[in-house]
Amino acid sequence: MPRVKGGTVTRARRKKTIKLAKGYFGSKHTLYKVAKQQVMKSGQYAFRDRRQRKRDFRKLWITRINAAARQHEMSYSRLMNGLKKAGIDINRKMLSEIAISDEKAFAQLVTKAKDALK
């Protein structure tokens, strides 16, 4: 019985890895062994950063809300506490968008939060 080397399967697998490594710097997009390692590492980075992205956006929203709240002589934490006590249930993403795009609406929210804290 002749020995089967599986050339087409191996070539296809290697070609797939090299295709995934397209655009990488140096030998990482041409040499199979190095490309394979980099594709694995890239996958780890992608997995980690999909979770990190959620934390980064939340930080950004909080920073924006804090900056807008301080223009109305109020800190972020007092604003959020006031909104909660006023029964205004709005998430940070939407609050951040309101702070950027609609100053008047945000000012009204701040006054309602201030009233609820009194």
From Swiss-Prot:
GO terms for cellular component: cytosolic large ribosomal subunit. Keywords: Ribonucleoprotein, Ribosomal protein, RNA-binding, rRNA-binding. The keyword rRNA-binding applies. GO terms for molecular function: rRNA binding; structural constituent of ribosome. It comes from the Bacteria. This is Large ribosomal subunit protein bL20. PANTHER family: 39S RIBOSOMAL PROTEIN L20 (PTHR10986). GO terms for biological process: ribosomal large subunit assembly; translation. Binds directly to 23S ribosomal RNA and is necessary for the in vitro assembly process of the 50S ribosomal subunit. It is not involved in the protein synthesizing functions of that subunit. Belongs to the bacterial ribosomal protein bL20 family.
